[in-house]
């Protein structure tokens, strides 16, 4: 993705201007349509009229996405001077253009100004809030297992979840509260009842849907046993699993695999096939297709070194020691990740390909040092999200949605 920044230091809040923008009826593009274009690899030019800091914190990305950032205040000033034509010409926009703002209001005004100047422009309906509601499901290759597996992708954050269906039973792994109804509906489409709602660990980047699915849909909550040591509230009547425990879903079996490092309690799940090489590994945030989980969210900087060492042991002795053909189904993807055409265009990959990509150093100390040097900024609201996922604090739906509106940042940055 390329991005051009044209904003000045004298910026005006797009939250404020969203409320005062003129009521216009510019042609719009739905967030789902935008996602489909990006997924197909079509060239997309975004004109993002949010402030620079908002764009730098969270933006729409993709392999062929180009973005120009100009504040709405600059457009308003150009209009007041009667110089919109000259201002737009200087932007040198590549058509068609999609205008973006927080809620799709001021960007509608900008799209209309562009169209008045002869630019092929559309407004992103509902803006970034609409983008955060895009949720896409694709089926993972699972012919050798006793289950059908859907991978859910939230492009706005890179969060991935999974629905495992076998016979008339289903389990959802790492569900998001914002989409709890979706898992139930999709299970019903397969003629199954959602029996289990499972978290691989205490999440720091999104509000878990496990509690809602347990309370409102009757699903059995399943969490790693170590979540109790992290302060899991007793009010949640959860089944706690340890290494080697099995969860039966119809004719399929999920086997727990303790995989600490990102957090102390993280427990991956393996869906077995006819042979060990036919399995799917739901790795949570322990292992991604191009990275692995950061070790500093549970115990901060003070405990990060020890957990990084634990992560090294988990990767080298447990996860990467599984059969090469194991399909890694991670808990997140990077914003710029490209779907894997060899795995039904999902964000999954064979374990041998993942191992080749990661190039884990032979020496633990070298690995630990590189991890600690490669930590990106922490998730923006993890201090609110973790207590909510432990059941220690309560967030209403609006607040729960808002605290997730940034990239997940749960992975270690790429290491050279």
Where are these regions (language model features)?
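Accessory terminal helices/loops
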Residues: 2-27, 42, 112-117, 313-416
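Cysteine-dependent PTP/DSP-like catalytic domain, specifically the C-terminal lobe
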Residues: 123-141
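Metallo-beta-lactamase
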Residues: 168-170, 177-179, 192-195, 263-374, ...
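Ser/Thr-glycine-rich phosphate-binding loops at phosphate-binding pockets of nucleotides
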Residues: 107, 198-201, 259, 263, ...
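Active-site HxH/HxHxD metal-binding segment of metal-dependent hydrolases
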Residues: 133, 177-258, 279
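Positively charged, proline/Ser/Thr-rich regional signature most characteristic
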Residues: 22-95
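Conserved beta-strand hairpin/beta-sheet module of binuclear metal-dependent hydrolase folds
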Residues: 51, 140-189, 269-283, 289-290
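Catalytic cysteine-centered active loop of the rhodanese-like fold, especially the PTP/DSP P-loop
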Residues: 70-72, 81-129
């Amino acid at each position: 993705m390329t991005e051009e920044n044209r904003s000045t230091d004298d910026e005006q809040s797009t939250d404020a201007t969203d409320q005062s923008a003129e009521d216009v009826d510019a042609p719009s593009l739905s967030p789902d349509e935008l996602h489909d274009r990006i997924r197909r690899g079509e060239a997309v030019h975004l004109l993002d009229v949010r402030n620079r800091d908002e764009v730098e914190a969270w933006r729409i990305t993709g392999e062929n996405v180009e973005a120009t950032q100009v504040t709405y205040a600059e457009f308003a000033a150009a209009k007041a001077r009667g110089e919109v034509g000259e201002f737009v010409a200087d932007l040198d926009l590549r058509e068609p253009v999609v205008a973006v703002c927080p809620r799709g209001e001021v960007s509608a005004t900008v799209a209309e100004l562009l169209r008045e100047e002869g630019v092929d422009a559309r407004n992103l309906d509902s803006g970034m809030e609409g983008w955060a509601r895009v949720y896409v499901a694709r089926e993972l290759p699972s012919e050798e297992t006793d289950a059908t597996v859907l991978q859910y992708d939230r492009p706005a954050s890179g969060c991935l979840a999974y629905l495992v269906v076998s016979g008339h039973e289903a389990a959802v792994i790492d569900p998001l509260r914002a989409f709890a109804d979706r898992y139930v509906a999709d299970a019903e489409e397969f003629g199954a009842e959602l029996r289990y709602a499972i978290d691989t660990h205490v999440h720091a980047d999104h509000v878990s849907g496990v509690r809602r699915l347990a309370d409102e849909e009757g699903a059995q909550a399943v969490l790693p046993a170590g979540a109790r040591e992290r302060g899991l509230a007793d009010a949640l009547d959860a089944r706690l699993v340890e290494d080697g425990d099995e969860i039966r879903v119809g004719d399929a079996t999920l086997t727990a695999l303790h995989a600490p490092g990102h957090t102390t309690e993280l427990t991956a799940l393996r869906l077995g096939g006819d042979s060990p090489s036919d399995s799917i590994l739901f790795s949570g945030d322990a292992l991604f297709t191009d990275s692995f989980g950061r070790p500093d969210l549970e115990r901060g900087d003070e405990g990060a070194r020890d957990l990084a060492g634990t992560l090294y042991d988990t990767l080298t002795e447990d996860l990467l020691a599984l059969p090469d053909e194991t399909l890694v189904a991670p808990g997140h993807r990077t914003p710029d990740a490209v779907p894997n055409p060899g795995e039904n265009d999902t964000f999954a990959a064979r374990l041998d390909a993942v191992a080749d990509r990661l190039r884990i150093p032979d020496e633990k100390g070298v690995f630990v040092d590189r991890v600690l040097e490669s930590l990106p900024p922490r998730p923006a609201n993890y201090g609110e999200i973790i207590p909510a996922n432990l059941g220690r604090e309560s967030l209403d739906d609006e607040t729960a949605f808002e605290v997730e509106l940034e990239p997940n940042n749960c992975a270690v940055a790429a290491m050279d």
